[in-house]
Amino acid sequence: DSLDRIVGENVQFIWQTGKFYDEDAKKVMAEKKPGNVVQTAFVSNMDEAYRAADLVVSRAGASSISELQLLGKASILVPSPNVAEDHQTKNALALVNRQAAMMVSDKDAPQKLIETVLTLLSDSDKLKTISDNVKGMALNNAVEKIVDRVFEIIERKK
């Protein structure tokens, strides 16, 4: 069991379960009482959670990836298999292929995710490389760049 594996590790976890899994997670937490895990249905101050995190485990939606890039957060991405055209796997691979994230498939997550987390957290060089690489992929000032491009197109059409 993954929770049994992390109890006693010198790592703090914030576990956002979502509303659907909240009650089941609360039962597991009450039974196991892991002192190094904070479970919540929803993280209302995500900026604080990101700031505290050395590593983020996340789905691979475009918004999540953009946040990770802008903040330069190392991540292990677990693409959702329940999305159109498997686009989350494509999103994740765009980072993985640039050594800007690691990926664990949804079906492999129960067996491999916690070990991948602990292995990466114990390798500060790899953690820094991933963080630096993902930060380098960030599109800073995206709105300004889009607006500038729109104005360029308008000027050409005059």
Locate the predicted segments by residue:
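C-terminal alpha-helical cap of glycosyltransferases
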Residues: 139-158
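Acidic donor-binding loop of glycosyltransferase active sites
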Residues: 51-64, 73
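Donor-nucleotide binding loops and adjacent catalytic segments primarily
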Residues: 1-55, 88-92, 97, 104-113
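Short glycine-/small-residue-rich Rossmann-like dinucleotide-binding loops
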Residues: 18, 61, 79
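Conserved acidic donor-binding segment of nucleotide-sugar-dependent glycosyltransferases
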Residues: 102-108, 120-124
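Short alpha-helical segment that forms part of, or immediately flanks, the ligand-binding pocket
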Residues: 47, 65-73, 93
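A short, well-ordered alpha-helix in the C-terminal region of glycosyltransferases
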Residues: 126-140
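Short hydrophobic beta-strand element within catalytic cores of glycosyltransferases
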Residues: 58, 74-85
